[in-house]
Swiss-Prot record:
GO terms for molecular function: rRNA binding; structural constituent of ribosome; transferase activity. One of the primary rRNA binding proteins. Required for association of the 30S and 50S subunits to form the 70S ribosome, for tRNA binding and peptide bond formation. It has been suggested to have peptidyltransferase activity; this is somewhat controversial. Makes several contacts with the 16S rRNA in the 70S ribosome. Residues 255-279 have a biased composition (Basic residues). The keyword rRNA-binding applies. SUPFAM superfamilies: Nucleic acid-binding proteins, Translation proteins SH3-like domain. This is Large ribosomal subunit protein uL2. It comes from Sulfurimonas denitrificans (strain ATCC 33889 / DSM 1251).
Length: 279
């Protein structure tokens, strides 16, 4: 896949780029694997905004993805490669020999017609196959990694990402995450071999505000452009600085201030991810 640019027929079209969709199969999605998610638009059950700058966005249906990969010992074939409006990578429709169909995240190098299989005891090391971390050789790239046994993959699911198995420590396996963080994960947890596909997604330029609105993101107003009643940075004559360190609308420090609470799982983190040197 490559980045596709367009002729500047309009100002918004000038910088607009997208990923070519030559890999997408022109077949309809499986209706039994589609579900309509309610659009909360950042509101809670009382209708109050709990997450700012959110809206419904373009209409879309959620594809039920098999993150658990718990269909052990049954081979499947990639029937189609499809676009998923809820994620930045492609998804693959897998048709198993017993007739069942499931969606999985499309790994890099997996094409229509290829065969895959998942098994807890270990299978061939090739993209799309899933097994326990303890059975994957050191140095292998993996994605869709479980944090808890049987819960389904929670880590490394974004387009173009992968984690690398660095070694084993008792019942744990050490992983180097895409953020450069080194952490331990139980060897009983499942993972899929290979890197997530659509690695060119990071190079896309949205090019216009409307494209962000389609994604369900509303505009953000600067605090310095508000009144003092609305934001700690507000007020003043003309364009003035805030006169204090950057804070949120509720007065809490922001822009580099650490907010992560300590958790019991901190002991599994060997090396923290690298912080932004510009901050």
């Amino acid at each position: 896949m490559a980045i596709k640019s367009y002729k500047p027929t309009t100002p918004s079209r000038r910088f607009y780029t997208n990923v070519e969709n030559n890999d997408i199969t022109s077949k309809p999605s499986v209706r039994s694997l589609l579900v309509k998610l309610p659009a909360s638009a950042g509101r809670n059950n009382n209708g109050r905004i709990t997450s700012r700058h959110r809206e419904a966005g373009a209409k879309k249906l959620y594809r039920i993805i098999d993150f658990k990969r718990d269909k052990f010992g049954i081979a499947g074939t990639v029937s189609t490669v499809e676009y998923d409006p809820y994620r930045n990578c492609r998804i693959a429709l897998i048709t198993y020999v017993d007739g069942e169909k499931r969606y999985i995240l499309l790994p890099k190098g997996l094409n229509v017609g290829d065969a895959i299989i998942a098994d807890a005891t270990g299978v061939d090391i090739k993209p799309g196959n899933a097994m326990k971390l303890m059975n994957i050789p050191v140095g292998t790239s993996v994605h869709n990694i479980e944090l808890k046994v049987g819960k389904g993959g929670q880590m490394v699911r974004s387009a173009g990402t992968s984690a690398q198995i660095m070694g084993r420590d008792g019942k744990y396996v050490s992983l180097r995450m895409p953020s450069s963080e080194m952490r331990l994960v139980l060897g009983e947890c499942m993972a899929t071999v290979g890197a997530v596909g659509n690695e060119e997604y990071i190079n896309i330029v949205l090019g216009k505000a409307g494209r962000t609105r389609h994604m369900g993101i509303r505009p953000q107003t600067r605090g310095s452009a508000m009144n003092p009643i609305d934001h700690p940075h507000g007020g003043g004559e003309g364009k003035t600085n805030s006169g204090r360190h950057p804070v949120t609308p509720w007065g809490k420090p922001t822009k580099g201030s650490k907010t992560r609470r300590k958790k019991a799982s901190d002991k599994l983190i060997i090396t923290r991810r690298k912080s932004n040197p510009k901050r």
